[in-house]
Regions:
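Glycine-rich loop-to-alpha-helix module at the N-terminal edge of alpha/beta enzyme cores
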Residues: 1-82
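A glycine- and small-aliphatic-rich helix-loop capping segment at beta-alpha/alpha-beta transitions
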Residues: 18, 76-83, 103-113, 167-170, ...
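PLP-dependent aspartate aminotransferase-fold enzymes
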Residues: 46-149
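A generic structural signal for well-ordered alpha-helical segments
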Residues: 53, 174-175
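A short helix->loop->beta-strand "cap" motif at the edges of active sites that frequently abuts
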Residues: 85, 177-180
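Active-site PLP attachment segment
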Residues: 100-101, 204-223
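Conserved PLP phosphate-binding loop immediately N-terminal to the Schiff-base lysine helix
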Residues: 151-165, 180-203
Length: 223
């Protein structure tokens, strides 16, 4: 993209429709959208997104970056279990961001820059369901899972590897059975980069949480 934000110019460089909408908004002297206060623009945006995603994905949270989206997803999954589960699973081939939680779930050690990780994170082999099952069995306590979330890129942009339909289908079944929050990170692959609006839409399954920030804004503020 010739900028510091890798993969953000999803809508082209200075697309005239986006520029016009931005200029018209400024001419009305409206304040920037502030997420600490109710905004009809944020409400309508969330409603519009819910109409293009599967029914189960009907609540939106709008952060500033892909890493913040992943941080929010991990926190929501942890809070879903009220802190009663302590373990997070991620793929050994992955990049989720450079913030503490996102970097803790990143499989490439050179991208975590030797910072400490959040506790109880475990990696499995990408696109290998037996590896997932092996770790899950180790982490069970009194036949109850200690895993609050599994995060994965269904299509890994860094390696150009993708998960098979069989792997994703069985992963979805396991997470549903064990009440584990399934997080799909499509920050790099979302918004039709793989043909479908999101890569997971090629398959008959839906994650519990989907991350797609960054290129969603087209490199502009307050899209």
């Amino acid at each position: 993209d010739f900028t510091g934000g890798i993969g953000v110019l999803n809508h082209g460089h200075n697309h005239p429709r986006i520029l016009k909408a931005r200029i018209d908004y400024q001419k009305q002297k409206k304040m920037e959208v502030h997420k600490n206060y109710f905004s009809p623009y944020v409400a309508v945006l969330g409603q519009n997104i819910s109409q293009i995603l599967p029914d189960d994905l009907n609540i939106s949270y709008f952060p500033n970056s892909g890493a913040e989206a992943v941080e929010g997803a991990i926190k929501m999954a942890y809070k879903y279990h009220n802190g009663n589960r302590k373990s997070l699973l991620y793929a050994d081939i992955s990049f989720h961001g450079k913030l503490l939680g996102a970097a803790s779930a990143t499989g490439s050690p050179e991208l975590s820059f030797d910072f400490p990780k959040i506790p109880n994170t475990y990696s499995f082999n990408y696109n290998n369901i037996d590896s997932v099952k092996k770790i899950l069995n180790k982490l069970k306590k009194k036949n109850t899972s200690d895993v609050y979330a599994i995060i994965i890129e269904p299509f890994n942009a860094s390696s150009l590897r993708n998960c098979s339909a069989e792997f994703l289908s069985e992963l979805r079944l396991i997470c549903s059975k064990e009440d584990i929050v399934l997080i799909f990170d499509e920050v790099y692959t979302g918004w039709s980069k793989t043909g479908e609006l999101f890569y997971f839409m090629n398959f008959d399954l839906v994650p519990d949480i989907l991350t797609y920030a960054k290129s969603f804004g087209g490199g502009k503020s307050s899209i």
